[in-house]
């Protein structure tokens, strides 16, 4: 519908600017290409505690890619990975999109990896009804980007700490 027209425009622009782009499913054999891309991504982004936590989480996901049964997709242009997304099925209705990275200097790269990953997941798991785009980590820009996809609902996030009895 009309509410996602801006996203379609970004994807159309990306396709015009990168007519030879391709997607490739992430496998243990090509996972290093995602590691390399995310390393470059972090080189150009300002460090903060949330970035450090995310970096650690992504490294762990890469280290345990097969054991965690994650799905992943890379967006490739001119032989270079310019975006990737990874996630895992939560149950028969929900899919968790854990990580999404793209070079923001490439117009439409985020919208395109989001679209292509969503299509791949919809094809692989046709029974799914919801994609969980996860937490915005309190970042206004990330929150705005996630809300631009017109989510069905936003859930409150809670942290729990285990306390010793006594």
Question: Residues of each region from the PLM?
Answer:
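Acyltransferase donor/substrate-recognition loop-hinge adjacent to the catalytic core
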Residues: 1-47
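Short, contiguous, pocket-lining structural segments
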Residues: 2, 6, 26-33, 53, ...
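Aromatic (often tryptophan-rich) hydrophobic motifs at membrane interfaces
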Residues: 72-163
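A generic secondary-structure signal
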Residues: 13, 40, 61-64, 120-124
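Short, hydrophobic/aromatic alpha-helical segments in well-folded domains
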Residues: 10, 37, 57-61, 116-117, ...
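Short, conserved active-site entrance elements at the starts or edges of catalytic domains
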Residues: 33-81
């Amino acid at each position: 519908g009309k509410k996602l027209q801006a996203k379609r425009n970004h994807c159309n622009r990306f396709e015009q600017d990168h007519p030879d782009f391709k997607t490739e499913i992430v496998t243990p054999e090509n996972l290093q290409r995602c590691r390399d891309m995310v390393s470059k991504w972090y080189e150009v982004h300002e460090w903060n505690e949330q970035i450090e936590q995310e970096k650690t989480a992504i490294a762990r996901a890469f280290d345990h890619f097969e054991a965690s049964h994650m799905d992943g997709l890379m967006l490739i242009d001119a032989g270079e990975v310019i975006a990737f997304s990874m996630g895992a099925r939560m149950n028969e209705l929900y899919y968790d999109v854990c990580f999404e990275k793209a070079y923001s200097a490439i117009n439409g790269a985020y919208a395109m990896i989001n679209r292509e990953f969503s299509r791949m997941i919809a094809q692989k798991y046709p029974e799914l009804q919801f994609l969980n785009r996860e937490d915005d980590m309190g970042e206004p820009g990330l929150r705005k980007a996630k809300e631009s996809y017109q989510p069905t609902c936003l859930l409150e996030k809670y942290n729990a700490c285990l306390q010793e009895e006594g």
